[in-house]
Amino acid sequence: FDNNTLIRKVVGQMTASGLRTVAYGPDYSNRVDVAVRRALLTGMGQLTGHISNMNGKKLGTDKFEVDWHPGARPEHAKWQGRVWTYQQLIDICGLGTGPGLLGWNCRHTYYPFIEGISVRNYSEEWLSQMEKKEAQKTRFRGKEYNTYEATQKQRQMETAMRAQREKAQLLKQGKAAPYDILNARCKYQAMLDEYKEFSKKMKLPEQRERIYYDLRGRVAPSQYTYQKWQAEQADKAAKRAAAKERKADRIHQEQAERNRRADMDAARRHQ
């Protein structure tokens, strides 16, 4: 099996009973798909860590090389790609803690490193180049993102799309008005288009498998229906803009009239 197949299976089992969120306390909860992915990937990462520890003991080494991946959170970017002793993995990388190495949502792992035999996968020069590259920002819709910020934005968009898919399906199951169902489906397609454009602009691979964990099948409307909906939305937006402009003009005219009357009153008082 692969990670995505396992996540889809577990999410399907949990949501089949009607479960939609997982509460971690009175003030914090996550959607089922978010909680499942975090739990499974974190657990598999920790299992890999235990295997690396066993291999390190067998090889007689206390040093390990942490792997590197793009878009690492800032706290992890400082130590990824480097060689550390096991104690340093704990003290510097936070091994064994939630926010540290192999903690919540951490995608890093580490492998035994034998001094004098092993060759580093990531040189300091290469790491320095990547650090500068990852810090570069790209503008989208008036906001700038570095690599980490862009990946976080991707995750937010994926979560929002899963929620929209669920909304569309629940409206259908609840036999809501056809227009409401269509509107929900078209909004989902619009979000998908935005996700595609954002990913292309940021030069990040799309991870649509994260969107389809729900196993809900096709939610997007036909191309013809979507284009018709887009035209309707554009027309509504144009009408709203025109109404807003008319309101602004009216307010401006009313203010001008008040100013004119105030000037006339002031002139009469000085006669």
What are these regions (language model features)?
Residues 95-114:
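C-terminal edge-of-domain segments
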Residues 1-98, 116-271:
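Domain-core detector
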